[in-house]
Amino acid sequence: MKEGSSISVAVRVRPFTEREKGLLAETPKSKEFLGDGSLAVSNTSSNTFCTNGIRKIVRVLDDNVLIFDPPEENPLAKVQKSLLPAGKRFRDVRYAFDRLFGEEASQEDVYKGTTEPLLDSVLQGYNATVFAYGATGCGKTHTISGRPDDPGIIFLTMRALLDRVEGLKRTMNVDISVSYLEIYNEKIRDLLVQDPLSMEKPKSLNICEDAEQNVSVPGLSYFTPTNLEEVMEIIIRGNSNRTMSPTEANAVSSRSHAVLQIYITQTPKSGEKQEESESQNSHKVRSVFSFIDLAGSERASATKNRGKRLVEGANINRSLLALGNCINSLCEPRRRQHVPYRDSKLTRLLKFSLGGNCRTCMIVCISPSSEHYDETHNTLKYGNRAKNIKTKVSRNVVSVDRHVSEYVRTIYELRQKVSILQKRIAEESKQLALNKEVRKISSREIKMLDARSMLKNSFDGSRDLQKSLIEHVRTLRRIEDEITLTKMWISIAKESDAMSGHNIKSVETRLAKLYDQRSLITAKVNPEEICKTFQNSISHIVSSFKGEGADMYADMLQDDVDLLKSIIENQILDAKHESETFSSTSRKLIQNLFLLFPLLPGNAIDVNESLARAFDQLVGIVPSEPTIQVPNLIEKGKAPLLSMFEIPRSPSRFKARSPSKAARVLKKPLKKRVRFSEVPTTSSVPPVEIKNKDSKPKVEKSLDKHNMNNDRSFLVPSRDARNSLTSLSLHSNVAKNKSSHSSKWPTHTLSPIITTALKQPVRRISLVSQPLQKTGGTENTPNA
């Protein structure tokens, strides 16, 4: 059984009385149970129509729900104005209760639905109370006491109790005693001690509370019934002594509150062969089963009471008002207000039935007649409130047959157990605290592992973004290199006056476009977007650590994020500085390029097509016309000189990044390189004319060996170029020949800037087929 329990509320609707039946708007043709105290079945029916009748204000829907003041279903009610007061509407209020009994319910049905479930609890040692509540003339006394031919729940309960006691006699000694009292005009009377025929005035009793705050009535008589006949005799005798008188509302009206209590004591039987010992204890189980028949509330105007009856009605209403106040206080425990149990003798007796150690069932008796409209409505409201009352129940077990010395020893043993349990609790508390700290650290370590896994996944997931970022950085570096070279070219072109102003402006336009490209690429180089993904992936874990006060773990995670950020920044720095600056080399290349223009022959000049393409890439101008294929100038045993003029896509071309990198494979085989003969730098070299067309001319130029090794910007004619020059005349002096140069040079193979440069005045040089000897002044032709 649960320690906390609510009051069970059941509603019983009594049938119409003979008088009420005659006042109905339409007399039903079915049998009617009369509610005048006898609840007899009426077979009389009339088809008369009453112009000033009453109506039914309660409709039962099922075992739990009823409707108060439902809409009228009688079609004649529309023409009968007396059924509903003027200006009022039907309330049509629904109430739900634990159990609902209609007009056709019998006493057995009410017993099984209300009292029978409490019988098992009483035998287990729990207190129980059943009381009937309602207005006068609603069937409370009939429900509790009944008649000999139709007994109430008291008789039915005692019958079931005696049957169960017979089954317990094998193991338990069960004692049953009964007391019966009434509260009349706030005075307590014993209903079993007085002779109904005696004219003596009954003695008034008082209410007391013992040390355990149990309510008792000193001087109250107790009877022990052994069979059902004795039980019925007690009930009849008590009802005979109870104060009753007829009123306008009820022909058999109870003028007092009646309380019948059944005291049950159970003691276990000891076996005949059971050894007696000092530690052996026997326990008594005590319980009280109370049945309370409350007097009905009544209105003086309805009952037309005068004199003594009026005083009785006032006292009844006073005690019921105190009961209603107690119910209201118990329904709202949050207010912790005082419950006025002492306002009435009735509430003092019901103190533990309402809010104490007791299981309580409240039977609300109501009338279906519209004559009791307000009383029925108030009764339903109080019953609905009583459902919210909570009670605490416990078994009433008392230990007996124990010597005083055993209590001292028991107390010592209990204290020892308490001390041991306290030590155990302290040790377990320390262990729990340690385990909690260990679990907390373990959970933090798990969070750290999860956070680092998230960081790794975030870093791996940003690989594409990192590659794109590095590519943007390299593109930006390439654009900056192109800008630097272009600015160098413009500066040297302006200093040497080798180019026209139109061409310089074209290059400056290209430089402006490079600036725009650099701005666009610079906007895309934003490592903060990647770093932000690292921070966002673990931000919730960092916040969790800070909320728990684990700043060390939060700082460790932040260090991991900073480490990943530094990796991204280092990748950017590596991409920016992965090649050495080549400003001095590129400047020397451009200077030698401009110095090369005056050295080109006027009518037959072999210019490598790659030189023009390299120059175009240098200034960023794409040739507008297709070029012809001209053999590359390749020095024997060395890399092509043309590669020095190409603008690399990345500065890594100037620096070997990895020894495992594959060597560059030339698409064409190396061709034999012809060198110029060494001649003193202070003397000029006379031209030599080769008349033999079959011989292959060789051109050598005497240069300082040191300058030759340091300055690699000279162009050397290839073997195919020499074959194309055999038909040209070689002269020793330099002559100007603008017209022949412009007419014979294939301008469609070069870019506009180079074409313009070649149109400038140039000096011719003579090519010799044999190297000159410094001594003897004779020429020696080398072997082919």
Swiss-Prot record:
It comes from the Eukaryota. Residues 405-440, 463-483 form a coiled coil. Keywords: ATP-binding, Cell cycle, Cell division, Centromere, Chromosome, Chromosome partition, Coiled coil, Cytoplasm, Cytoskeleton, Kinetochore, Microtubule, Mitosis, Motor protein, Nucleotide-binding. One of its GO terms (cellular component) is cortical microtubule. One of its GO terms (molecular function) is microtubule binding. Pfam families: Kinesin. Its main location: cytoplasm. Residues 690-709 have a biased composition (Basic and acidic residues). Residues 6-389 form the Kinesin motor domain. It is found in: Cytoplasm; Cytoplasm, Cytoskeleton; Chromosome, Centromere, Kinetochore; Cytoplasm, Cytoskeleton, Spindle. Heterodimer with klp5. This is Kinesin-like protein 6. It comes from Schizosaccharomyces pombe (strain 972 / ATCC 24843) (Fission yeast).
